[in-house]
A protein has these predicted regions:
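C-terminal ends and interior cores of transmembrane alpha-helices
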Residues: 87-100, 310-325
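Conserved MFS/SLC helix-loop-helix module at the cytosolic interface between two early adjacent transmembrane helices
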Residues: 65-103
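Extracellular/periplasmic helix-loop-helix junction of adjacent transmembrane segments
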Residues: 35-66
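Helix-breaking motifs and short loop linkers at transmembrane-helix boundaries and internal kinks
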Residues: 46, 77, 98-104, 115, ...
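Central cavity-lining transmembrane alpha-helices of secondary-active solute carriers
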Residues: 57-71, 273-286
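Cytoplasmic helix-loop-helix junction between adjacent transmembrane helices
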Residues: 108-147
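Helix-loop-helix hairpin linking two adjacent transmembrane segments in secondary transporters
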Residues: 143-196
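Extracytoplasmic gate region of multi-pass secondary transporters
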Residues: 34-35, 229-284, 344-345, 349
Length: 431
């Protein structure tokens, strides 16, 4: 850091997670720009819906390399690794403004997806590094608000840029915001043991709240070892089943509103952001439910599982999106889907920091994220290949059912930790 006087900040960890949340906001704003601009881009360049599914598929292929991002973050360290990825996604996003065909978009979306795949493991590594165990659920929720806020801001901001200038300017504008955040990150972030603004009391509080069984082992994380663990698949498979909801809200709902509901660009700007407002609330609702149950004696793991189950139950409302006549009812059901998805998603994501060592968290988050993005990829390709024949309704039905299966897997694959009981001590005095 420059030789300046930095004041001590109380609760510095919340400033840090706020900084990471801001990065996530910009991350999801840039990735959502394509979905919002899609009706205009497809019309301007003559791109078909099937070709658009390949463009979104390229993004998912890139982001499926998230385990590489996680490994880089665990190896290089959070500050350096996240800075490299932030610079890469910002430049890739701005380059979208130069694309002239679907192939060019596909290449750039793949690069963007790879770089932006760093956000989730970086967020989870921040949570694991900076927060005691009892605060991680809420901290993870705060970080994941960034995904919802970024996606929420995309419709009005991108439509404004398109109508004021053109769709190319929209990509340049959102990408440039990432470079601004990068400067803030490099200036302000340091690890807890090196940050000049951290008080000794907070440093001790963070250290005291770490579980000893999750302490760093000192060796690089082993991907093979992680993949062999049942608890990893208890996180990864629910991600595979849940993440298609987010991909649909981000990349396909604007087209659905345009092609099926007859919305114009201004109407998309008015309504397409609402599911992400609801998702913001879900980011906080899931950890709140888990915390409420913990306060009443439910174990940490079981509290998380019940929060996921509640979210999965609410997701069944998505079944009716395509079956209601009123566009307002459809938007309301999409909002319920956004709320329910983030209720369960943020909870599942946070479990990586509950179940694995701190030096494994980013790698685990990256591997689980790869599974989630594989689910989004396959689901997007199915939509692109079949929507012209069967419409959107069957896909909304599938989204309403998949998370129920994910909740069952979570309960089946992840076992609650049983604390060892102390040896009984006789109450009868020795003679």
């Amino acid at each position: 850091l420059p030789k300046l006087s930095f004041p001590k900040l109380r609760a510095l960890r919340w400033w840090i997670i706020g900084l990471v949340m801001l990065g996530a906001i910009i991350n999801y704003l840039t990735r959502s720009t394509m979905g919002v601009a899609a009706p205009t881009v497809l019309k301007d360049l003559g791109i078909t819906v099937t070709e658009y599914s390949w463009i979104t598929g390229a993004f998912q292929l890139g982001i499926m390399l998230q385990p590489v991002c996680g490994y880089v973050l665990d190896t290089l360290g959070l500050r350096t690794g996240f800075a490299v990825f932030a610079a890469a996604w910002s430049l890739a996003a701005m380059a979208h403004g130069l694309a002239s065909n679907w192939q060019g978009f596909a290449v750039l979306r793949g690069l963007l997806g790879f770089a932006e795949g760093s956000a989730q493991p970086a967020g989870m590594k921040t949570v694991a590094t900076w927060f005691p165990a009892k605060e991680r659920g809420f901290a993870g929720g705060v970080f994941n608000i960034g995904a919802s806020v970024g996606s929420m801001l995309a419709p009005p901001l991108v439509v404004w840029a398109v109508l004021t200038w053109n769709w190319r300017a929209a990509f340049v504008m959102t990408g440039a915001l990432g470079l601004v955040w990068l400067a803030l990150w490099l200036f302000f972030y340091r690890s807890p043991d090196q940050h000049p603004s951290m008080t000794q009391a907070e440093r001790e509080r963070i250290a005291a709240g770490q579980e000893t069984h999750l302490a760093e082992a000192g060796a690089k994380p082993s991907v093979i070892s992680i993949l062999k663990q049942r608890k990893f698949w208890g996180i990864a498979l629910p991600r595979f089943l849940a993440d298609p909801t987010w991909g649909t809200l981000s990349f396909w709902v604007p087209l659905y509103l345009s092609q099926t509901r007859g919305f114009d660009l201004k109407q998309i700007a008015m309504f397409a952001w609402l599911p992400f407002v609801a998702a913001d609330l879900g980011c906080l609702f899931g950890p709140t439910v888990a915390g409420f149950l913990q306060a009443r004696g439910v174990s940490l793991i079981n509290a998380r599982r019940w929060a996921v189950t509640l979210g999965a139950a609410m997701m069944t409302g998505m079944i009716f999106v395509g079956r209601v006549e009123s566009p307002y009812a459809a938007i309301a059901l999409l909002c319920l889907g956004g709320f329910a998805h983030q209720t369960l998603s943020v909870t599942v994501i946070t479990m990586a920091s509950d179940l694995f060592r701190r030096d494994e968290v980013a790698t685990v988050a990256g591997l689980a994220g790869m599974m989630g993005n594989l689910g989004v990829l396959l689901f997007s390709l199915l939509i692109g290949g079949l929507v012209a024949t069967i419409g959107y309704d069957p896909f909304f039905v599938a989204l309403g059912v998949l998370d129920i299966l994910g909740a069952i897997i979570l309960w089946t694959f992840i076992r609650d930790r049983i604390e060892p009981k102390a040896e009984p001590v006789s109450q009868i005095p020795n003679p």
